[in-house]
Amino acid sequence: MWLGLAVFWTFATRHTKPARWRESIGSRTLHVLPLLAGAVLLAAPHWLPSVLSTRIVPGGRSFSVLGAVMVAGGLGFAAWARARLGRNWSGIVTVKEDHALVRTGPYRAVRHPIYTGLLLALIGTAMTIGEWRGVVAVIFVLIGFLWKIHVEEERMCENFPEYAQYRQQTAALIPLLY
């Protein structure tokens, strides 16, 4: 499922608008490093201390199925949000030429639905793996997302006067909570 999202993402990046502002490399590093740490934790269990490979979720089909459903739902939600952004999307924080504020589709529920979907999928992956490394990976990725949200919010407030109202009315990452 993750591979399917990667293929979709790759093709969807071909026709984005040109950027008129880009996030600095230093700022980008602050959200990319935790994401990479999370990916390593999930992908390379034999490199990790044994405590991170300790199973914390009971084995069995029900947790695996629930995890797989969360992965599918989360990736689907993220893909929907990405498609809704259209040419405004970028993998790094940018301000595009003729940038438009999107408040429809999944953006009605949360301001950063791509991260919401990816986080749900990652939690599902961690549940399926069932080890401490999954929990630690989720924490690292959440830290990366929270930094990126902070940077994106600053740019959105600077470029869209109506963003302040959208921010008051719509949760950032988790509907009705945050």
Please give the residue ranges for each predicted region.
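Alpha-helical membrane-protein architecture signal
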Residues: 99-107, 116
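Membrane-anchoring alpha-helices and their flanking helix-loop junctions
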Residues: 1-96, 103, 121-178
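Short, conserved phosphate/pyrophosphate- and ester-handling motifs at nucleotide-, phospho-/glycolipid
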Residues: 112
